[in-house]
Amino acid sequence: MDKSQGVLLSSNVGAGSRPWPELLGSAHWDGLLDPLDLTLRRLILLCGDLCQVTYDSFNSDSHSRYCGSCRFSRATLLDRTQFPAAGDLSVAAYLYATSDATAFPGSMVYSMSREAWSKESNWIGYVAVSNDAAAAASGQRVIYVAWRGTIRSLEWVDVLKPDLVDHDDILPEGHPGRGRSRVMKGWYLIYSSTDERSPFSKYSARDQMLAAVRELVARYRNESLSVVCTGHSLGASLATLCAFDIVVNGVSKVGDGAHIPVTAVVFGSPQIGNPEFKKQFEEQPNLRALHVRNTPDLIPLYPSGLLGYANVGKTLQVDSKKSPYVKRDTSPGDYHNLQGILHTVAGWDGKDGEFKLQVKRSVALVNKSSGFLKDSNLVPESWWVERNKGMVLGQNGEWQLEGPAEENLPVPPVVTGKIIDDDVAAVATSSSAKEGKKTGKGSKLLSGLIDQLLCVPDTCKAGAA
């Protein structure tokens, strides 16, 4: 039985497919987007489902003590979310973020409990890598960085202030973008902020990510390596920023050799920065971005060029209105829904072509967290839910929220070692964009080796959280 849902498996890479560098945009996807190349289509769906894992595993119930955390351990994340390529990847690290609630309303959720696991941090994504079997089958060792988007409604668009700020803190000394390249404050604070009050945010999401990617690049330096950053909505902005960061700070450089390719594959992305950021991004020879955009979705138009923003990378434009499976009259949020976009990718045959599923992918996935499908498909709305919303009947006869099993409890990231090498990029020391105990400085120079941040199931004891 085909359970791949159309995503790229290690067994699909090789004979009959375009070379891996081309799929990652080495030639800017010339000749691959219209018509949409089959292997690239599968890679896009793989990235989309990596993003979906962040939604399916995120605890957003404010009644739970563990609201804002991931429901599953690294060892079980992909299996528990029924990720179709779970047999090909191992989750190496979890990423946690903190941010001032006023910087990006709706980006963080917190428990109402006085005994909450954290009052300052949220799980924001993960780093995964091809396991040994998949790398051997495909000839590629791929590091994936998946960022979670906001789980709130699109009301955040009305209240989010699109202020542009410099990101000199994450640019090396002497970089031509310093003082000129600017990104949206909301994205940047989530990416680069720390909070000493939280053991999960003593290091920024950025620091956690860079440490994880650097260690994996060092571990697999003798193999054919690449990095793919992916995200949807807010996560798309973080993925684009993170891909840029990896390249300009030399994390993609293998020893004294060349830089490995780094690609952002993003969905429904708001605009990230000003024209100078776009220029600096697109001038990097080993850096690419592919933005999958649904035509009726308005979020990619935000904040707009009128406010000083510019689009980054190549765009694959699809249109969900061509699908015969979805409603014609629907809410704006449905056009932005990730599974709606992935469904459209699965059946896309160009602007003038007929919509027809080109890979086997369940139509029911569209309604995973929406009501976008026509009622005639007989699929209930928003069907991906915890059984009884996590309520269980206790031995005392009382119904109560069930806490996570011990192996699924949140574990603070431990980062030791240099996040940025001194001889590759110097860490800027400009003032923080935030006040108080939270800081927006993107990097910390630490001594020693990276330790305990990563636990890849291929090499670590089974069952590690």
Swiss-Prot record:
Gene Ontology CC annotations of this record: cytoplasm
Subcellular location(s) of the protein: Cytoplasm
Molecular function terms, GO-annotated: phospholipase A1 activity
Cytoplasm found in the keyword field: yes
Gene3D superfamilies named among the record's database cross-references: alpha/beta hydrolase
SUPFAM superfamilies membership: alpha/beta-Hydrolases (SSF53474)
Signal peptide: none
EC numbers, comma separated: 3.1.1.-
Record-linked InterPro entries: AB_hydrolase_fold (IPR029058), Fungal_lipase-type (IPR002921), PLA (IPR033556)
GO terms of biological process kind: cellular response to UV-B; lipid catabolic process; UV protection
Keywords from the UniProt entry: Cytoplasm, Hydrolase, Lipid degradation, Lipid metabolism
Active site: 233, 297, 336
Enzyme class, broadest EC rank: hydrolase
Family of the protein in this entry: Belongs to the AB hydrolase superfamily. Lipase family.
Functional summary from the UniProt entry: Acylhydrolase that catalyzes the hydrolysis of phospholipids at the sn-1 position.
The name this protein goes by in its record: Phospholipase A1-II 5
